[in-house]
């Protein structure tokens, strides 16, 4: 396995999934996500961009206040495959000044071996096995929902985005995905920090 310490899904005997949200927090979308999660009694994990936490500390504080777990998604949403290791690690460390978590998810799911090796002793790299593609302009909300229905399995780590780019599809797909998953016997867990 390329990155044996990396978590792609968390297999379980009973039906459970891990909802995760990347790229926030932002005041235009994240509070709505929090309200949806509260409505359904769900705890999730938010992989936050440090610069968004810096700009919107009250939104980040609300994520924590409502009992969700958080992870580091770099300071500036850097794509690891095109950035040198030293710069990438510095960006992660800068974000850590705003985000107190040992969880890390590389933006775009891309990280080089040397970058992963540099952080593996201090951080747990959490990827995903189901990306909803809610950010895609080529998909509508129904297609995003279909991605969840088609690809979910026990222990899936599901990625949505609390971002402006994903907002339209997210607002359609998230409540419907939650309801469908509940109807099909899934429970929801945050990724332990």
Locate each region found by the language model.
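Charged catalytic carboxylate motif
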Residues: 32, 91, 173
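N-terminal pre-catalytic segment of deacetylase/amide-hydrolase enzymes
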Residues: 1-20, 25-41, 55-58, 176-193
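Metal-dependent polysaccharide deacetylase catalytic core of the NodB/CE4 family, i.e.
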Residues: 16-17, 27, 38-165
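Catalytic grooves of carbohydrate-active enzymes
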Residues: 148-192
């Amino acid at each position: 396995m390329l990155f044996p310490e990396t978590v792609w899904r968390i297999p379980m005997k009973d039906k459970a999934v891990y909802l995760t949200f990347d790229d926030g927090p932002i005041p235009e979308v994240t509070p709505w996500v929090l309200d949806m999660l509260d409505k359904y009694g769900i705890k999730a994990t938010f992989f936050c961009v440090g610069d968004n936490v810096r700009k919107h500390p009250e939104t980040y504080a609300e994520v924590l206040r409502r009992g969700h777990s958080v992870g580091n998604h770099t300071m500036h949403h850097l794509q690891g495959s095109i950035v040198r290791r030293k710069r990438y690690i510095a960006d992660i460390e800068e974000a850590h000044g705003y985000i107190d978590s040992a969880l890390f998810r590389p933006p775009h799911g891309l990280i080089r071996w040397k970058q992963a090796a540099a952080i593996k002793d201090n951080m747990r790299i959490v990827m995903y096995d189901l990306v909803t593609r809610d950010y895609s302009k080529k998909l509508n909300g129904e297609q995003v929902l279909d991605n969840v229905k088609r690809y979910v399995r026990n222990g899936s780590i599901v990625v949505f985005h609390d971002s402006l780019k994903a907002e339209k599809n997210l607002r359609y797909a998230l409540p419907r995905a939650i309801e469908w998953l509940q109807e099909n016997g899934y429970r929801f867990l945050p990724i332990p920090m």
